[in-house]
Amino acid sequence: MTNGSTEVYLGLGSNQGDRNLYIEKALSMLDSTPGVRVEEKSSVIETEPWGFESENCFLNCAVRVNVDSTVSPESLLETCKEIETELGRNEFMEYREDGSRVYHSRNIDIDILLYGDRRISSERLTVPHPLMAERDFVMVPLRQIATDGIENAFPEIFRPALKTSAK
């Protein structure tokens, strides 16, 4: 992280169409966003869908980006949502009677996992991502690129035990 910038970690996933192409297009669009620079990408792993049934497995990866001080967490979230929409994602939110979210297949999904050492809780954004520690499809790639500083800032997330759902 350079002076005036924040180290941010994003999770990307796709289980429809040309999954690799959607991930690469999303990364290119992120990198061309003013104030956002993609620094490192994890390997891409293939995983079963989480929270719903689908014949299509996901490709998932994590990326570390540097975000300068002109980019707020909320504006980065908006950028991620705009990229998802441009790449064909339908942001229809469906919930079960118990209040839990119903998940669907998608061309691209971009989640803000960590935003520096900040903890954010707003109506639209929660950081650290609330379910990331439960999801190997997030944690396996994230561990590949996480710096010691970020691991030390969130010891509760970087637990030693992992389930094995990645292929």
Question: How would you name each of these model-derived features?
Answer:
Residues Q16, S69-P73, P141:
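Short, surface-exposed loop/turn motifs that are enriched in glycine and acidic residues
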Residues K25, M29-V71, L76-L77:
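Short, surface-exposed acidic-centric catalytic microdomains
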Residues D18-N20, D31-E40, I112-Y115:
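Short, mixed-charge, low-aromatic patches
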Residues Y9, G13, N66, Y103:
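Short, flexible active-site loop motifs that bind/organize anionic cofactors or intermediates
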Residues W50-F58, E74-K167:
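Flexible, gly/pro- and Lys/Arg-enriched active-site loops
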Residues T2-L27, G35:
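Extended accessory regions or peripheral subdomains of proteins
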Residues V8-L10, C61, I110:
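Hydrophobic residues positioned within well-ordered beta-strands of beta-sheet architectures
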Residues S14, V63-S69, L114-G116:
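Short beta-strand-to-loop capping motifs
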